[in-house]
């Protein structure tokens, strides 16, 4: 949820944010009206309750002659209080709905526009030049790493098996990511992948993109599309001690996405699938530290990309391509030779206080146990995921169809070269 203080003091800033996202700025006026109506309803109900309390006391002290009139007035006030409380509840519900409808306020400097309006911040390495490159699926099948056919047989489209060295390659990548995280002060976690609706909603994943989420209807639980969700819920309804600096967690989990809006897109291979594995960094910090922490997350992502030795670029994602919770997002996109373009491997988002306000995650101002609780800031960032196999296989392929294993992953895979295997099974 956005900060109501900002809304009331500078509604134009919120309107500008909505416009830069390509979203309806009139929602800001609807929220202002709902806020005013809610406060008026609360005031009316409070006034009537105070009057009712005073009238009740008067009845007890009244003379027999005065009592009938006072009792009638008390009854009338009771009915008015009941009606006012109903009106207050309705106003509160309307306010909450209006509040939830507005996306996070984007940070100054974020490019306006949609998916293609990003700004390129840096380009690292030259695009890999190959004659007649094989795509990652052809390589994966030839090398005995990926089995899409049996994945589809068992589970349907966009499912797969990672087999043999393919499984070791992914496990090595994620172990490398987790090791990097631990070296930089992250607490490693293996979180639950099923969460309650309030946690999924609190992170902003049940809004416009709710159709992307798998729901277990019988248990009213949701399968997470990223461990950002359970890690954001980890400190819900808590007051944190941030006096020693940010709290950093690294979650390793399977992730599940319906890809409901992706019909016909990336149907080949493991670029866009229903299930994958990921190590996700998640940070709680003070709002004042959030932008610096965002740069740190980006730096750790870049370090991981350097370790897998692929060319990539860093982009500042345009406002219209941000999720509702993000105030700014940087993506690292690796070069994919067979597509002759860059594809996203990592994203890191500064969600400012948006998620923490929904989940009631606060910290003590100044670290003082008696300090006033303030809303914390949250950030997240990918440190490694299944999609990285695409960039590794395609950029490190050799003319004979083998693939060189990046040096950092050799200890995990057990070989420097992935070579074609004969038919099995």
From Swiss-Prot:
EC code(s) of this entry: 6.1.1.11
Subcellular location as annotated: Cytoplasm
Pathway: Aminoacyl-tRNA biosynthesis; selenocysteinyl-tRNA(Sec) biosynthesis; L-seryl-tRNA(Sec) from L-serine and tRNA(Sec): step 1/1
Catalytic activity: tRNA(Ser) + L-serine + ATP = L-seryl-tRNA(Ser) + AMP + diphosphate + H(+); tRNA(Sec) + L-serine + ATP = L-seryl-tRNA(Sec) + AMP + diphosphate + H(+)
Signal peptide range in chain numbering: none
Domain notes: Consists of two distinct domains, a catalytic core and a N-terminal extension that is involved in tRNA binding.
Keyword terms of this UniProt record: Aminoacyl-tRNA synthetase, ATP-binding, Cytoplasm, Ligase, Nucleotide-binding, Protein biosynthesis
Biological processes, Gene Ontology terms: selenocysteine biosynthetic process; seryl-tRNA aminoacylation
Superkingdom, natural source: Bacteria
Residues reported in the UniProt entry to bind ATP: 257-259, 273, 344-347
Top class in the EC scheme: ligase
Transferase as UniProt keyword: no
Organism expressing this protein natively: Mycolicibacterium paratuberculosis (strain ATCC BAA-968 / K-10)
Assembly and interaction partners: Homodimer. The tRNA molecule binds across the dimer.
Binding site for L-serine: 226-228, 280, 382
The protein's name in its UniProt record: Serine--tRNA ligase
Gene name linked to the record: serS
Gene Ontology molecular function: any one: ATP binding
Family classification: Belongs to the class-II aminoacyl-tRNA synthetase family. Type-1 seryl-tRNA synthetase subfamily.
SS bond partners: none
UniProt keyword Nucleotide-binding, yes or no: yes
One Gene Ontology term, aspect cellular component: cytoplasm
InterPro entries in UniProt: aa-tRNA-synt_IIb, aa-tRNA-synth_II, aa-tRNA-synth_II/BPL/LPL, Ser-tRNA-ligase_type_1, Ser-tRNA-synth_1_N, SerRS_1_N_sf, SerRS_core, tRNA-bd_arm
Function summary: Catalyzes the attachment of serine to tRNA(Ser). Is also able to aminoacylate tRNA(Sec) with serine, to form the misacylated tRNA L-seryl-tRNA(Sec), which will be further converted into selenocysteinyl-tRNA(Sec).
